[in-house]
Amino acid sequence: MSGRRVGAYKEPGDDNVTETAEELGSSRPFVVEITVRGYETDTQGHLNQAVYLQYAEHARWSLLQAAGIRQSAMVERRIGPVTLETTIRYKRELRAGDETQVSCAFLWGEGKTFVIEQTVTTADGMVAAELSAVGGLLDLDHRKLLPDPRATFRELATEPTLLSLG
């Protein structure tokens, strides 16, 4: 699954992306654009509920990649992101051919977990869904959460401001 402008920073209604990551810092959420495909719809003719999770996952990995975090680097360190909880609030249906923007922002607290807030919007700026996920970084050998995922992401990232770590 790929967005047309993976890694674009834009708000609904913006036609051009002209700012660099450095200019924006973490002032606006990271956004990927995805066109709803016909095979992703269900018998009601709207986007199948499970596909929202795929769109959210695509945006999260695109953000990590834009921040300079490679999946291979995590595998080499024997760590990986894990989702512990996800809540989806459906606001408006999406149909085949609809252009969407999926935003992604990491929110940091203390401890082993973090929150990822995401919004799926239509081309005209209407909110189609809101997603909130609790995640962590798993030690792949010991099968336990790392005590400080924030510090680990900061070490791995070449653009930590994209993850609100600047």
Please provide the spans of the model-predicted regions.
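Early exported N-terminus immediately downstream of N-terminal targeting peptides
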Residues: 32, 50-52
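Intrinsically disordered, low-complexity regions enriched in serine, threonine, proline
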Residues: 1-4, 57
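Active-site helix/loop of acyl-thioester processing domains in fatty-acid/polyketide metabolism
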Residues: 52-75
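HotDog/MaoC-like acyl-thioester-processing domains
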Residues: 3-32, 65, 93-96, 106-166
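Helix-adjacent hinge/juxtasegments
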Residues: 75-80, 84-106
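Short acidic, Pro/Gly- and aromatic-enriched capping/linker segments at domain boundaries
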Residues: 34-36
